[in-house]
Amino acid sequence: MAGLNDVPFIKGLAVPSVCALIIFLGYASQFLFNYSTTLEPGPPTRRETIIFNGLLLVLWITYYRTVATDPGRYIFKDRVIEAEGQRWCNKCAAPKPPRAHHCRHCARCVPRMDHHCPWTRNCVSMTTFPHFLRFLIYTNMSLWMLGYFLWQRFSKIWEHRRLPAYLGPSFYGLICLSLISIVNFVTTVALGIMLINTVKSWVFNQTMIEGWEQERHEALMDKGPKEWWDIMGPDGEKVRFERLEFPYDIGFFSNMAQAMGTHNVLLWFFPFAGNPTVAKDGNGQGWTWEENGFNRIEGLWPPPDPDKLRRAARGWPAGNRNYAEELRQANMSSSEYKAGFLKRQADDEKRKRHLMAELEEVDDFDMYDDEEYDRELDQGLGWVNSDGDRLRDYGVDEEASEPEGVNDDDDDDDDDDVPLAELIRRRKILKKDGLDD
C-alpha cells in the first residue's frame, strides 16, 4: 500500500477510484437487487434499505473529512536557527517535536504521523486519525451488510440449483451478482485487515512508523553490541545504546481518548465529531506527549539509528567542498572557465582509462557475485521490517532527519562543516533580527 504513494498515475486517480468503488458497490448493487426480477428473495426490505443507505451516507461524510482535514502543521512564534537537544528537520529548517515526522508528500512535519495514505492523498496524523478510523469502521459495516445481501441471493440460487435454468436468475443478472461479490470480497478482506491494524494502533497508542521503529530497535538489541560498537557521536564519544520500552502507551482508555481528542466515548464514533488540533502556543497538544515512565528518563524515543549515526560521522559530502576554489572560479571569464572544465574532463578520462586497465589485469573480475552486490545495495537503502517496509514506504522523508546531537554547537569549529549557503542564511537572519530590534 505504501509504495503506491510513488506512482503518479495512482496518486491522481486515488480519490476518484475510491469514489467509483463506493458507487459501484453501494448503488449498483441496490439497482441489481431492486430491478432484477429473477433474483430471489427480491428487493431488500424498507428497513434494510434505510439502514444500508444510512451507512453509505455516513461513509461519504467520514471519507470526505479524512481527505479534506488538514494533517496539521507546526507554527513557531519566533524564527529558530538551531535547537539544542531537540530533533531537527533539515527540510523545514525548524525543530521537530516528538512523534512528528517530515512527510515527503505533504512537504511538512506532520504531528503524530502514522503514514501517508495513497487512497486519501492525505496523512493519517494526530488531526486526521479520528476521521480515518470512523471511515474504516463505517466502510466495513457497509461491506458486511452488502455481504449479507449477497449471501441471501446466493443461498437461494444454491437452494434452487436442481430447477431448470430458465427458472433461475438471468445470465446478465448472475454475471453482475458474481462481479459485485468478487469485488466486495476483496475489498472486505483488504479493509478488514486495515481496520484491525488501525484499531491496534489506536489501542496501543503506537503509529505504524513507531511500530517500525520498535521492531528495528528490538532487532538491533537482539543482535547485541556487535552492531553498534564502532559508532561514535558528534562529540567523539561512543553512543550509548540501551533497550527502550515504548513510552507513549499510557493505558487502554487514555490511549484511545488521546487519539480521538475527547474522553466522551459517544463522540468517538459520531461522524460529525471533531478532531485534535495542534496547540498554537508551541506547548501542549501536538508539541508534548505524556510518557509512561518505563524508561530511565523521558524523551529517549525514537531509539538511535546506527545507520544514520554512521552517515553523520562520515559527514555531508558538501562539507568537503573547496569553497575557496569555487569563489576563485566565480571570478573567471567564460573562456578561462571553459578551459578549466576541459582540463578536468581530460583528467577524468585519464583516470578512467587507468582504472579500466587495472580491472583488466584481474583474472576473476567476471566472477563477481551479483547477488552479493544486490544484497549490499538493498542494505544500503536502510533497514526493513518483517513486512519488507522501509521508513520511506510510510511517507517519511528520511533525508529531513538528523541524529540527535548533529546540530549541537559545542565547539566553534563546528561551523567548518556547515554549508556556505546555510552560513549565509543564518547571517541574514541575524542581521534582520538586529534591524528589527
Curated annotation (Swiss-Prot):
Residues 377-419 are annotated as: Disordered. The keyword Ribonucleoprotein does not apply. Residues 396-419 have a biased composition (Acidic residues). It is a multi-pass membrane protein. Residues 87-137 form the DHHC domain. Its EC number is 2.3.1.225. GO terms for molecular function: protein-cysteine S-palmitoyltransferase activity. Its main location: endoplasmic reticulum. Residues 1-12, 70-130, 195-437 are cytoplasmic. The active site is at C117 (s-palmitoyl cysteine intermediate). Keywords: Acyltransferase, Endoplasmic reticulum, Lipoprotein, Membrane, Palmitate, Transferase, Transmembrane, Transmembrane helix. It is found in: Endoplasmic reticulum membrane. The chain crosses the membrane at residues 13-33, 49-69, 131-151, 174-194. The DHHC domain is required for palmitoyltransferase activity. Mediates the reversible addition of palmitate to target proteins, thereby regulating their membrane association and biological function. Belongs to the DHHC palmitoyltransferase family. PFA4 subfamily. This is Palmitoyltransferase PFA4. It comes from Gibberella zeae (strain ATCC MYA-4620 / CBS 123657 / FGSC 9075 / NRRL 31084 / PH-1) (Wheat head blight fungus). The lineage of its organism: Eukaryota, Fungi, Dikarya, Ascomycota, Pezizomycotina.
